[in-house]
Amino acid sequence: MTEILRYCQGIMQRGIKESIKTLYYTGELKFGTLVGVDKVGNRYYENRQEIYGRHRWVEYGDYKSNDPTTIPPEYHSWIHHVSDKLPSEMLPFSPTYKRPHIANPTGTDGAYTPPNFLFNIEKSKEELQKEEKNDNKQ
């Protein structure tokens, strides 16, 4: 009975279309207050009536690829209970070595591979030719 009530509350908060999409991609329909949205489009929610550890969650901007590496460090600390303050409540901290947050490129063309790796043969040949041309110019 409580599940039916919970689904009804979720549908009332989101609407039927969004509820069906969320239920399809996540397998769960939760409701709570929207706490924030990051620059990637991830939406962060909190519901203090849920049990501890399940009362904070994220809905990814891209429904089809739920990639946890798209969560920026500011919201990572909030969602994992390192900090109870939201990024909007914290003082901005930007060290000199900080780079923009990117998702983990493993399994894509942007992934790191060592120079003598089997699939880098063409890349290494091109780099060697460029180095030889630069050496000949000097």
Swiss-Prot record:
Q: Does the keyword Electron transport apply?
A: yes
Annotated region Disordered: the residues are 97-116
Keywords annotated in UniProt: Electron transport, Membrane, Mitochondrion, Mitochondrion inner membrane, Respiratory chain, Transport
Keyword Secreted present in the record's keywords: the answer is: no
Please report the record's description of how this protein sits within the membrane: Peripheral membrane protein
Q: Where found? A: Mitochondrion inner membrane
Q: Which InterPro entries match?
A: NDUFA12
A GO cellular-component term linked to this record: mitochondrion
On the tree of life, the source organism's domain of life is: Eukaryota
Function recorded in the entry: Accessory subunit of the mitochondrial membrane respiratory chain NADH dehydrogenase (Complex I), that is believed not to be involved in catalysis. Complex I functions in the transfer of electrons from NADH to the respiratory chain. The immediate electron acceptor for the enzyme is believed to be ubiquinone.
**So what family is this one in?**
Belongs to the complex I NDUFA12 subunit family.
Assembly and binders? Complex I is composed of 45 different subunits.
Please state what the protein is called: NADH dehydrogenase [ubiquinone] 1 alpha subcomplex subunit 12
Which species does this protein come from? Dictyostelium discoideum
Q: Which gene encodes it?
A: ndufa12
